[in-house]
């Protein structure tokens, strides 16, 4: 089944190098601790950034959102924004990438002394991972479009702030599974008041009469 994130398979992805805390590892050898907060608890934040013709699209906005999200969960990223940006470019250079690349920037709270949620048992600095992959959009999906269905899973701030790009994606995963069971590729999620909020993996827009309509942004990750 197609999806909004379908891309053209690129064999170069089998040989990429991944950044983990300042070091580069071949994807077959890239590992984090089983005691990492991101693995144990989904405790952290992330951003997805596109490289197009040697330009990182809206880079500063993505980095600002990353740090805002970290601040909202009381997590201090020990590297400055400038250092994070330098690490991204260094990773791209390490892989000789110049375009059609998606970068997954991940920051978890760090390694725990034991599997427990309280930040006080974190015994390391945050774990920073940068995964660059060649991802050129699948033209067949662009031409055909996707099937969208309204799902029962809601976007609600009572449990978790939907404006944070959290590593914990269970809310969106539930909507994704529900949409697939209904024969669609993407789930349209409503807010607690029954209004359109977002999709499970993308923002939602309607373009009509030269106008762009979208949700208020109160119950979804605000787009960049």
Where are these regions (language model features)?
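Conserved alpha/beta cores of soluble small-molecule-handling proteins
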Residues: 1-188, 192-195, 221
């Amino acid at each position: 089944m197609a999806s909004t994130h379908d891309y053209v398979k690129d064999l170069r992805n089998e040989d990429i190098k991944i950044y983990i805390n300042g070091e580069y590892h071949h994807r077959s050898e890239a590992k984090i601790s089983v005691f990492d907060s991101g693995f144990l608890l989904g405790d952290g934040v992330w951003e997805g950034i596109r490289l197009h013709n040697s330009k990182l699209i809206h880079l500063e906005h993505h980095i600002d959102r990353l740090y805002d999200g970290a601040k909202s969960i009381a997590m201090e990223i020990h590297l400055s924004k400038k250092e994070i940006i330098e690490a991204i470019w260094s990773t791209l250079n390490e892989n000789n990438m110049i375009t059609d690349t998606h970068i997954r920037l991940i920051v978890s709270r760090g390694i725990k002394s034991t599997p427990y949620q309280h930040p006080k048992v974190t015994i390391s600095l945050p774990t920073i991972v940068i995964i660059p992959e060649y991802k050129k959009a699948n033209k067949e999906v662009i031409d055909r479009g996707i099937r969208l269905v309204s799902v029962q899973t809601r976007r609600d701030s009572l449990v978790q702030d939907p404006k944070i790009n959290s590593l914990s994606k269970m809310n969106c995963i539930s909507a994704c599974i529900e949409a697939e069971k209904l024969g669609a590729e993407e789930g349209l999620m409503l807010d607690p008041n029954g209004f359109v909020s977002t999709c499970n993996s993308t923002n939602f827009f309607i373009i009509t009469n030269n106008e762009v309509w979208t949700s208020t942004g109160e119950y979804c990750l605000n787009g960049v």
